């Protein structure tokens, strides 16, 4: 009877037949992790290039508010072919997928550097370059759990996932720092601007940043081309050596799994809104007279704090297994309170909360620490919940939905740019909604059970 309700792939034994092969880890796993993390870092850096310097970009290239929002929107739009990259990772492995991703980033960064005098054409080239960089997003955001399972032992997986997934966010954070510090604001009265001319100096600095990013991306692409194997000679764990479901079966199983959909919404809504919110943080803080440089520092430290906490929490999860849900509840409680504080600060006339640089810094940094810190824990929980569905497919569906919510938020931003306080309310509401979803979620650790209780 049961055979009628299962596919041929699901009736295959989970473990491959044959003699025992003791799991083993290789030192080269750290090189693979380093190259992938560098690629993820650069993709995040390029994606967030324009939001932190939106005032300078308007002056240098005559970008409109719609252009700035669209430059950020190319990130989630780039996730439209996400399912193609998921199929490629599942069928061709890490090397082919990561190489294609790096090539798209090289082409995108190069397109932004084409020296054209016509500003209308230059704007189109920059938009095209951002779109190509957006197409690299599915791999750098999805592949971290797949890479950690393929190369790392069970007591290192959460740490490897945290490092690989957090570096993309760290790249976005460094854009908050690099852009405002290198590119002068249009209202600057520095000697450089007085000597070189405001518009020309700003444009030269922006182009210098784009040339530097292109050069670094090309070097990383060359390194990946030289050495980036899909898998180690011997699997590092029982889970890495086990069979997985087919692509079609995996998609159907994911979409029919209510527990998975519940925890996916708990991730996709707040993290998607947070990505869109942080991408236009400069616009949000402009009405309260926060300068471009100060907004950059706020964005930088909020994401850096989240990256540090995410990696630390990942290491903690490796040390004490089976506590992913309590960690998420703790982090989202902090995120909900911090986002509420930030939102109410903008209503100081009603709430009488002090609106100062210190309160903005503190509340923004806490939001980033708590929300970004949940990413690697979520990824590990997704994989544990739906195992033996491949990690790349699982996280592909998750990040596609996250970018869908980010795209919806930014789409509304292109339509309504007068008062951006509604963005703060969206972020706060999404944190409380996610907290409810996590509290209702029933956790399981199927992959961990296989590694702990089954020996090859």
From Swiss-Prot:
* Entry keyword annotation includes Transmembrane helix: yes
Per the UniProt topology annotation, the Lumenal ranges are 51-67, 117-131, 184-207, 281-292, 348-362, 414-420
Identify one Gene Ontology CC term for this UniProt entry: lysosomal membrane
Motif Di-leucine motif, per the record, lies over 14-15
Q: Name one GO molecular function term.
A: transmembrane transporter activity
User: What's its catalytic activity?
Assistant: pyridoxine(out) + n H(+)(out) = pyridoxine(in) + n H(+)(in)
* Positions on the Cytoplasmic side per record topology: 1-29, 89-95, 153-162, 229-259, 314-326, 384-392, 442-456
Family to which this protein belongs = Belongs to the major facilitator superfamily.
Q: What does this protein do?
A: Mediates H(+)-dependent pyridoxine transport.
Q: What is this protein called?
A: Solute carrier family 49 member 4 homolog
- Its source organism is Xenopus tropicalis
Chain's gene name: slc49a4
């Amino acid at each position: 009877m049961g055979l009628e309700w299962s596919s041929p792939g699901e009736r295959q034994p989970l473990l491959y037949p044959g003699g025992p092969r003791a799991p083993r880890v290789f030192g080269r796993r750290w090189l693979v992790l380093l190259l992938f993390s560098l690629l993820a870092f650069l993709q995040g850096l390029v994606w967030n290039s324009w939001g932190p310097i939106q005032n300078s970009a308007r002056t240098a290239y005559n970008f409109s508010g719609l252009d700035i929002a669209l430059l950020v929107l190319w990130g989630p739009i780039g996730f439209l072919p996400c399912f193609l990259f998921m199929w490629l990772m599942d069928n061709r492995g890490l090397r082919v997928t990561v190489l294609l991703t790096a090539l798209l980033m090289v082409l995108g960064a190069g397109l932004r550097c084409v020296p054209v005098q016509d500003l209308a054409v230059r704007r189109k080239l920059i938009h095209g370059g951002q779109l190509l960089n957006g197409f690299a997003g599915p791999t750098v955001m999805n592949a971290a759990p797949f890479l950690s399972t393929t190369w790392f032992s069970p007591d290192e997986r959460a740490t490897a996932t945290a490092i690989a997934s957090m570096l993309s966010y760290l790249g976005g954070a460094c854009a908050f720092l690099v852009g405002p510090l290198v590119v002068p604001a249009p209202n600057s009265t520095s000697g450089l601007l007085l000597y070189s001319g405001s518009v020309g100096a700003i444009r030269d600095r922006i182009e210098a940043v784009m040339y530097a990013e292109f050069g670094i991306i090309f070097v990383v692409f060359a390194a990946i081309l030289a050495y980036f194997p899909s898998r180690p000679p011997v699997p590092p764990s029982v889970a890495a050596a086990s069979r997985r479901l087919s692509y079609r079966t995996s998609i159907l199983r994911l979409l029919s799994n209510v527990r998975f959909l519940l925890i996916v919404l708990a991730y996709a809504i707040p993290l998607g809104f947070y990505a869109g919110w942080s991408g236009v943080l400069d616009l949000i803080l402009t009405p309260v007279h926060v300068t471009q440089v100060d907004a950059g520092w706020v964005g930088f430290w909020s994401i850096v704090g989240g990256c540090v906490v995410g990696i630390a929490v990942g290491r903690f999860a490796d040390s004490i297994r089976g506590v992913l849900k309590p960690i998420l509840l703790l982090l989202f409680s902090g995120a909900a309170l911090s986002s509420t504080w930030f939102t109410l600060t903008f209503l100081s006339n009603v709430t009488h909360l002090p609106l100062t640089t210190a309160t903005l810094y503190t509340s923004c940094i806490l939001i980033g620490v708590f929300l970004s810190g949940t990413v690697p824990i979520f990824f590990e929980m997704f994989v544990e919940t739906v195992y033996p569905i491949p990690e790349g497919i699982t996280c592909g569906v998750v990040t596609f939905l996250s970018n869908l919510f980010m795209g919806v938020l930014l789409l509304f931003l292109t339509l309504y740019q007068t008062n951006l306080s509604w963005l703060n309310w969206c972020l706060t509401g999404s944190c409380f909604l996610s907290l409810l979803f996590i509290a209702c979620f029933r956790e399981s650790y199927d992959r961990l059970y296989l590694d702990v209780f089954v020996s090859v």
